[in-house]
From Swiss-Prot:
Gene Ontology BP, a term: purine nucleotide biosynthetic process
Record organism: Parabacteroides distasonis (strain ATCC 8503 / DSM 20701 / CIP 104284 / JCM 5825 / NCTC 11152)
Record function comment: Catalyzes the oxidation of 5,10-methylenetetrahydrofolate to 5,10-methenyltetrahydrofolate and then the hydrolysis of 5,10-methenyltetrahydrofolate to 10-formyltetrahydrofolate.
EC number: 1.5.1.5, 3.5.4.9
Protein name listed in UniProt: Bifunctional protein FolD
Protein keywords: Amino-acid biosynthesis, Histidine biosynthesis, Hydrolase, Methionine biosynthesis, Multifunctional enzyme, NADP, One-carbon metabolism, Oxidoreductase, Purine biosynthesis
Membership in a protein family: Belongs to the tetrahydrofolate dehydrogenase/cyclohydrolase family.
GO cellular component: cytosol
Gene designation per UniProt: folD
Length: 298
């Protein structure tokens, strides 16, 4: 048995620590007679993944001491009705931040809904104003998954300056913001960034030259052992629900990295589950706290 020389980037442990820090801060706000941060979430329909995420967000709010409101609509809600609710939350002074859980049903334009959210309450960081401010390095709400990954790298003191970072995936939610953040002029950042996607040629060569690989493709076990150099840092954003006869729920979460092959070559790697997932939720909570304190937008 060769000795394990990689270290886990333990999102579960880090998020628990951050939860504790935030709960203490909320207790202080409360003791001083300040306003308790309030997060609202809109959930449309009954998508299994969305139900799980939203339940987890509400539970974390309670654990930290935030106020939370869950607003449910049926699958057949009209776009107009949804936009009216968004407008109502925009104008509710008690709500500091809110999210609309994606994906939305086909008959509703996600972009239209995102753009209707007041960017000062857009704690998901999806509004074009927040995305734009992020890309030019201004204070903003950074979307939760990229923000969570940065915090994870920071708390493990991962060296990033001058390193080659390969981002696999170019989605607006993870790939693009991740690439932007990894090349910003601050820590963690200052990387040389390559973005690869389904149309990329020499993908294996790119990965083999990477010091840091952030995998956000949604393709289970895509990154294999022969694509990774010794000592690389691997961040696995993938969470695909795969059928499983072993688990109680009948499915297991599978990452985009073939863990057993890749881990032995790494210096650091995130597990799935327990890596990026918990960091995403805790980063949404941090954005809510910042919104409550008016720390980014007055």
């Amino acid at each position: 048995m060769e000795e394990q020389h990689y270290q886990l980037l333990d999102g579960k442990a880090v998020s628990a620590q951050m939860k504790k820090e935030m709960a203490e801060e909320v207790a202080q706000i409360k003791a001083a007679g300040g306003k308790i941060p309030h997060l609202a979430a809109i959930l449309v329909g009954h998508d299994g993944g969305s139900e799980t995420y939203v339940a987890s967000k509400v539970k974390t709010c309670q654990e930290i001491g935030f106020k939370s409101t869950l607003i449910r609509f049926e699958e057949d809600v009209t776009e107009e009705e949804l936009l009216r609710k968004v407008d109502e939350l925009n104008n509710d002074p008690d709500v500091d931040g809110f999210i609309v859980q994606l994906p939305l049903p086909k008959h509703i334009s996600e972009q239209k809904v995102i753009e209707a959210i007041d960017y000062r309450k857009d704690v998901d960081g999806f509004h074009p104003i927040n995305v734009g401010r992020m890309s030019i390095g201004l204070p903003c709400f950074v979307s939760a998954t990229p923000a969570g990954i940065l915090e994870l790298l920071k708390r493990y003191h991962i060296e990033t300056q001058g390193k080659h970072c390969v981002v696999l995936g170019r989605s607006n939610i993870v790939g693009k913001p991740m690439a932007t953040l990894m090349m910003q002029k601050s820590y963690p950042g200052d990387c040389t960034v390559t973005v690869c996607h389904s149309r990329s040629k020499n993908l294996k060569e790119m990965c083999l030259s990477a010091d840091i690989i952030i995998v956000a493709l949604g393709v289970p076990e895509f990154l294999k052992g022969d694509m990774v150099k010794e000592g690389a840092v691997i961040v696995d954003v993938g969470t695909t629900r795969m059928p499983s006869s072993i688990t109680k729920s009948g499915f297991k979460l599978t990452g985009d990295v073939l863990f057993n092959e890749v881990a032995p070559k790494c210096s650091y790697i995130t597990p799935v589950p327990g890596g990026v997932g918990p960091m995403t939720i805790i980063s949404l909570m941090r954005n809510t706290l910042l919104a409550g304190k008016k720390a980014i937008y007055k």
